[in-house]
Amino acid sequence: MVVKPEWLRVKAPQWQRVGSVKELLRDLNLNTVCEEASCPNIGECFYQGTATFLMMGPACTRACPYCDIDFEKKPLPLDPTEPQRLAEAVVRMRLNHVVITSVNRDDLADGGASQFVATIEAVRQRSPQTTIEVLIPDLCGNWQALDQILAAGPEVLNHNTETVPRLYRRVRPQGNYQRSLELLQRVRDRAPWIYSKSGIMVGLGETSEEVVALMQDLRQVGCDILTIGQYLQPSPKHLAVQAFIPPEQFEEWRRLGESMGFLQVVSSPLTRSSYHAEQVRALMQQYPRQRPAPSPLG
């Protein structure tokens, strides 16, 4: 058994503030990936009044052995009121930046793209000053569905590659590394004004050389932002941690990624794909992109 090192211990949150966020989420019947995936940063994020909203859940149609989200082959139908409830939460929490993600919905023809579009539109209507980041699944390679999401105009589109290609069969058996790269390439080709983002976990048995090769693959498809964090085993039934990577290695990857041309690399043991995501607003000011008037993608 690999013993968890001191650098992975987090401070206890101030539960009064955390409780108020949880109360709001329960009031609006919303799920968060913070809770469903047992994120170690939940206390810090809830204390700061931020959350990553999990749509179309809480059950997922894939059973990835690293993930703590419940598996359900046939989840409940989509709730048409969810986009408006999520937009209401954005207003109540006064969010400058919102991260919206979802479970995999392989049971739906469009993978849930229409729900992403409806939610982006609802947030735009209720809180036009809020920048929107969507963290999407691979949509089973349905690129028309991806185009629908891109046309809705989120500022950031995130799709996590999760791990190095050698480990996909064990870590992400229903995923496909090349399909994930193609998704990110299509974001760059179809909507170059959108900031693209991806994230990976380490500590699953990959080598540093494999991580560097993955980073190079992401740059080749035009990925702008990269997050790297330590994998933590949610329960004994999930994949075991193979190694706890020291903070110095994360810092080395951060420096290397910046030298490769990523606009931002967030790399530390406790980094998760949505951790401090609001910092992208400063990045957008530093590297502005001209967004054309809304129109269907041709």
UniProtKB/Swiss-Prot annotation:
It is an enzyme of class 2 (transferase). Residues 46-263 form the Radical SAM core domain. Gene3D superfamilies: Aldolase class I. Its EC number is 2.8.1.8. CDD domains: Radical_SAM (cd01335). Keywords: 4Fe-4S, Cytoplasm, Iron, Iron-sulfur, Metal-binding, S-adenosyl-L-methionine, Transferase. GO terms for cellular component: cytoplasm. Pathway: Protein modification; protein lipoylation via endogenous pathway; protein N(6)-(lipoyl)lysine from octanoyl-[acyl-carrier-protein]: step 2/2. Binds 2 [4Fe-4S] clusters per subunit. One cluster is coordinated with 3 cysteines and an exchangeable S-adenosyl-L-methionine. Its main location: cytoplasm. [4Fe-4S] cluster 2 binds at residues 60, 64, 67. The keyword 4Fe-4S applies. [4Fe-4S] cluster 1 binds at residues 34, 39, 45, 274. InterPro entries: Aldolase_TIM (IPR013785), Elp3/MiaA/NifB-like_rSAM (IPR006638), LIAS_N (IPR031691), Lipoyl_synth (IPR003698), rSAM (IPR007197). It catalyses: [[Fe-S] cluster scaffold protein carrying a second [4Fe-4S](2+) cluster] + N(6)-octanoyl-L-lysyl-[protein] + 2 oxidized [2Fe-2S]-[ferredoxin] + 2 S-adenosyl-L-methionine + 4 H(+) = [[Fe-S] cluster scaffold protein] + N(6)-[(R)-dihydrolipoyl]-L-lysyl-[protein] + 4 Fe(3+) + 2 hydrogen sulfide + 2 5'-deoxyadenosine + 2 L-methionine + 2 reduced [2Fe-2S]-[ferredoxin]. GO terms for molecular function: 4 iron, 4 sulfur cluster binding; lipoate synthase activity; metal ion binding. It is found in: Cytoplasm. Belongs to the radical SAM superfamily. Lipoyl synthase family. This is Lipoyl synthase 1. It comes from Thermosynechococcus vestitus (strain NIES-2133 / IAM M-273 / BP-1).
